Amino acid sequence: MRIDAFLPALTVSPATFISRAFEGVGVSDLDFESVEFNRKWDVRCVDERFAWLFCDASMIDTILELGDGVTVETFGNYILFTRDLVGDAAALLRFLEHVTQVPAHLNPLVREEYPTVAAMESRGMIDEWSQRPDGR
């Protein structure tokens, strides 16, 4: 799903035995207010502040509703959702309905704090312009 903000890399993935083993040796994920969420998912992000903005109570509830086995990632101006396609068509349709509601649950501060696509394109053009030889 494309949104109009460039986001830091974040991964919300199902907790596994291996991820719990890493936590046991000090490579921990981020924990939030929801005990159920912390038990079921690992959150890793290069920008902890962004992770807290993204994983607010509304988004945590949305991710919990998506069901077990779902991974949510942010990449540039995309929010990506992956899950196994095993299951009936009705379950897949419910999943897609929940995913389409994600923009409504996205914390408004995320859009305010992180640059828009137009701003990033503008920065790129300014950088290209400033690197011309002799400023011409």
Predicted regions and their residues:
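Charged, low-complexity intrinsically disordered regions
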Residues: 1-136
